[in-house]
From Swiss-Prot:
Protein's name according to its UniProt entry: 3-hydroxyacyl-[acyl-carrier-protein] dehydratase FabZ
Source lineage: Bacteria, Bacillati, Bacillota, Clostridia, Eubacteriales
This enzyme's EC code(s): 4.2.1.59
PANTHER family for this protein: 3-HYDROXYACYL-[ACYL-CARRIER-PROTEIN] DEHYDRATASE
Record keyword Lipid biosynthesis present: yes
Keywords: Cytoplasm, Lipid A biosynthesis, Lipid biosynthesis, Lipid metabolism, Lyase
Species this protein is from: Clostridium acetobutylicum (strain ATCC 824 / DSM 792 / JCM 1419 / IAM 19013 / LMG 5710 / NBRC 13948 / NRRL B-527 / VKM B-1787 / 2291 / W)
GO CC term, one of those recorded: membrane
Positions annotated as active site in the UniProt record: H49
Protein localization: Cytoplasm
Superkingdom of origin organism: Bacteria
Amino acid sequence: MSLSIEQIMEIIPHRYPMLLVDRVEEIEPGKRAVGYKNVTFNEQIFQGHYPGKPIMPGVLMIEALAQLGGVAILSLDKYKGKKPILGAVKNAKFRRMVVPGDVLKLEIEIVKVKGPAGIGKGIATVNGEKAVEAEITFMIV
């Protein structure tokens, strides 16, 4: 099952300029998802990070993974209409710079859910090369 940007916006509340998932290619509701972020020079953040050498901030790569996790968990009927809140980030490792023109492939696996809280393990790659990996704790409110 794949999701368009319009379908993604029906599931998570994020909007421009903070909507960081452009397409979902695979989804198993409540379990895992694979999606993409197309990194473009026109994004506001690149005006200041950094002039003359634009680099996607690591925290935005983490946020993109968290949003994909939100799509995965909020696709379950019992969480429809709720909001995902980032609770913690553990073991984040940044392996590669991400620049305009890159396509960031996002993969998240929901490894634990207990009540309104859960943990996802995410990896983002560019052309098969790992850019970031992290364990993300979330709350559903």
